């Protein structure tokens, strides 16, 4: 568990099922998440069960962004590569909690975790040029564009 102010980023828990169902089935974020069809409660329950696998084995890890005990978003490490010491990062916040600084605090926590605990040297993210809020978020924490829609932060 990683914390700052009122924000905690923590692993998925079994009681996050309804939150995850709401988040993953929000069609407004499908264009940035790669989702093409709705998830069932059973699929997401299975996902939560298997999401507890170590990042070194699974190659990814999802954290829940928790505000005073309420799940408001997720922040993920994906495409984890131990040898290259890098990983992808993605963040999504429920609509009613956006533009309040929660994504920035969460991303800053995740970057610190990636540098200090996972010993990563690079994080990357794929961001659509139309996603101005995400561009501003990642730029504000030092990510730089390396290719069209690809942003990198080096340690």
Regions found by a protein language model. Name each.
Residues 1-17, 26, 64-155:
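Acyl-donor (CoA/ACP) binding surface of acyl/acetyltransferases
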Residues 15-18, 56-58:
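Short acidic-aromatic low-complexity motifs
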Residues 19, 43-46, 50, 105, ...:
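Alpha-helical elements of Rossmann-like donor-binding domains used by nucleotide-donor carbohydrate transfer enzymes
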Residues 22-23:
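Conserved catalytic core of Hanks-type protein kinase domains
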Residues 36-37, 60, 154:
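Sparse recognition of residues in long alpha-helices and their boundaries
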Residues 37-40, 54, 82, 127:
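Alpha-helix initiation/capping motif
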Residues 51-64:
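A short helix-loop-beta-strand connector motif used in the catalytic cores of GNAT acetyltransferases and
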């Amino acid at each position: 568990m990683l914390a700052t102010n009122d924000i905690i980023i923590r692993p998925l828990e079994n009681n996050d099922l309804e939150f995850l169902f709401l988040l993953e089935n929000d069609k407004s974020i499908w264009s940035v998440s790669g989702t093409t069809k709705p998830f069932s409660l059973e699929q997401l329950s299975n996902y939560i069960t298997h999401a507890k696998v170590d990042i070194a084995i699974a190659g990814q890890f999802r954290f829940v962004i928790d505000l005073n005990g309420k799940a408001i978003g997720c922040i993920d490490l994906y495409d984890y590569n131990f040898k290259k010491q890098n990983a992808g990062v993605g963040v999504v916040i429920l609509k009613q909690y956006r533009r309040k600084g929660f994504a920035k605090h969460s991303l800053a926590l995740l970057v610190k975790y990636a540098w200090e605990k996972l010993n990563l040297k690079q994080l990357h993210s794929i961001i659509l040029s139309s996603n101005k809020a995400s561009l501003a978020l990642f730029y504000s924490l030092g990510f730089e564009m390396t290719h069209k829609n690809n942003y990198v932060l080096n340690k």
